Design a protein with these regions (language model features):
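Conserved glycine-rich cofactor-binding loop
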Residues: 8, 15-17
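Conserved glycine-rich Rossmann-like NAD(P)H-binding loop of the short-chain dehydrogenase/reductase
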Residues: 29-46
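Residue(s) in the substrate-gating loop at a strand-loop-helix junction
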Residues: 143
């Protein structure tokens, strides 16, 4: 038996990059995979096909992870489609690098909203489900810059430090 056989994983921001790699690895271990991305595009459709080719159920959901109501609706739909959520991987993230003195409020807000607020949104939506199931795992993707900081990435560093604090507090 594979490590995650019979489990359902929800991976945010998994249309490409690290999120896609996580989704593919979970599928290799037998998990059915629900995943989100900002829009359903060619890359997302290709990821879905790759997951299904591994013999698991897979479905992509368009979601603005920074929107509280949208994330709750996506989680509701995942439960309707898959029956449960055993693993949440908060991976959705962006960068908008720049020195603090040149950074706009919009750049700050965009990174905090996608990288940190989205994790709160999805955790808020899945914890009642996991509590009812009497189990589940939540993985928050952070970065070394959440601990050390990084010049030119104060928004990104703050968002990743927030992810660490969030993980320690739930």
């Amino acid at each position: 038996m594979k490590l995650l056989e019979g489990k359902v994983a929800l991976v945010t921001g998994a249309g490409r990059g690290i999120g896609k790699a996580i989704a593919l690895r979970y599928a290799q271990e037998g998990a059915d995979v629900a995943f989100t991305d900002l829009a359903i595009n060619e890359a997302v459709e290709e990821t879905t096909k790759e997951l299904e080719a591994m013999g698991v159920k897979a479905k992509a959901y368009a979601s603005n992870a920074a929107n509280f109501d949208e994330t709750h609706e996506v989680v509701k739909q995942v439960v309707e489609d898959f029956g449960r959520i055993d693993v949440l991987v908060n991976n959705a993230g962006i960068t908008k690098d720049g020195l603090m003195m040149r950074m706009s409020e919009a750049q700050w807000d965009a990174v905090i909203n996608v990288n940190l607020k989205s994790a709160f949104n999805f955790i808020h939506a899945v914890t009642p489900i996991m509590a009812k199931q009497r189990g589940g795992s939540i993985i928050n993707m952070s970065s070394v810059v959440g601990v050390s900081g990084n010049a030119g990435q104060c928004n990104y560093s703050a968002s990743k430090a927030g992810m660490i604090g969030l993980a320690k507090s739930i």
